């Protein structure tokens, strides 16, 4: 699915976030960046058969931005970006030592029930960014969606007061609650011009 790495000299928390993402994106890998350039990373992702490269950028010790890049030697390019309020790691939610998914299965993206059109739009965008599959929620349970799509993992777009949240379910671990990580998104931007900003959505005017 994707190769996951960070900007140069990441903090421990950012590395932990990368490892957590490796455990919820099927058949993906977290790789220590070292001195590798973006071109080096793209070649490594291509050699390993991945369709996406995800780079986690750091600010003041915490993950600030997630950059998604399409892996294709003839048509590689930036797809889009998520700007974050913050994250909660799996261990902070109560889960440790979750194994990665080392087999091919769909990464399904849906929404919580009773959310707005902005959440549905972001669910579709998140599926594009990750190479996943968007499935409308309707009245279906998450377990029903997982069963119909032959997967153990679902990313769910949820309400959050200052933006939107992405949470992750691993049904091979527990069917009762999400395992994380929890990603709190304040802005998303796609290279084709689509974008969303929580301040604009809430009508908050910038300070002059």
Curated annotation (Swiss-Prot):
GO terms for molecular function: rRNA binding. Residues 1-196 form the Brix domain. The keyword Oxidoreductase does not apply. PROSITE patterns: BRIX. GO terms for biological process: rRNA processing. Keywords: Ribosome biogenesis. It comes from the Archaea. NCBIfam families: PRK03972.1. Probably involved in the biogenesis of the ribosome. This is Probable Brix domain-containing ribosomal biogenesis protein. The lineage of its organism: Archaea, Methanobacteriati, Methanobacteriota, Thermococci, Thermococcales.
């Amino acid at each position: 699915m994707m190769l996951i790495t960070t900007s140069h000299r990441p903090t421990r928390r950012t590395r932990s976030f990368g490892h957590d993402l490796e455990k919820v994106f099927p058949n993906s890998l977290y790789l220590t960046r070292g001195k590798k350039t973006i071109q080096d990373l793209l070649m490594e992702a291509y050699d390993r058969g991945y369709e996406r490269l995800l780079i986690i950028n750091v600010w003041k010790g915490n993950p600030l931005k997630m950059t998604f890049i399409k892996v294709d030697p003839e048509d590689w390019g930036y797809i889009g970006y998520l700007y974050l309020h913050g994250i909660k790691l799996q261990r902070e939610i109560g889960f440790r030592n979750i194994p990665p998914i080392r087999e091919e299965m769909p990464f399904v993206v849906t929404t919580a029930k009773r959310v707005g059109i902005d959440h549905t739009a972001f669910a579709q965008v998140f599926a594009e960014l990750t190479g996943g599959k968007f499935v409308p929620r309707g009245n279906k349970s998450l377990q029903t969606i997982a069963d119909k799509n032959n997967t153990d993992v679902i990313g769910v777009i949820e309400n959050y007061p200052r933006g939107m949240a992405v949470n992750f379910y691993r049904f091979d671990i527990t069917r009762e609650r999400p395992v994380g990580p929890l990603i709190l998104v304040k802005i998303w931007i796609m290279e084709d011009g689509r974008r969303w900003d929580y301040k604009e959505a809430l009508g908050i005017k910038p300070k002059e």
